[in-house]
Regions:
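One-carbon transfer enzymes
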Residues: 1-118
């Protein structure tokens, strides 16, 4: 299955690793842009990007996933499914409707009971 994975922090890495281990074809990883850290303001990869790079998977880091160029960029991958975990941006309907089997959001707690931005 052709998968686009969208995520950013450490706890999303486990999900990405399991998708890869299951033998699915991860055609693209979408993560938040790298951030400047420390006095040197060196750019730091997101944990999900680090994982993708380690597996040789292409990474896309849009400032705004809602931008038309982001929507068109994702469209070219013809994904069967998009799996999202802690991506950090609201995904537009144009992307949600794109994959053949839809989009699945993985949440670290029971919904709606534990719905919040800080759910762990």
């Amino acid at each position: 299955m052709r998968v686009i994975f969208m995520g950013t922090p450490d706890f999303a890495v486990g999900t990405l690793e399991e998708i890869i281990k299951a033998g699915h074809e991860v055609v693209l990883v979408v993560s938040q842009p790298d951030k400047a850290v420390g006095r040197s303001k060196a750019l730091k990869y997101t944990p999900v990007k680090e994982c993708a790079v380690a597996h040789g998977i292409e990474v896309y880091q849009p400032a705004k996933i809602r931008a038309e160029e982001s929507v068109e960029y994702l469209r070219q991958y013809n994904a069967d499914i998009i799996i999202v975990e802690a991506f950090g941006q609201i995904i537009p309907k144009a992307i949600l409707d794109m994959p053949r089997f839809g989009c699945v959001n993985v949440h670290a707690s029971l919904l709606p009971k534990y719905l919040s931005l800080i759910h762990i």
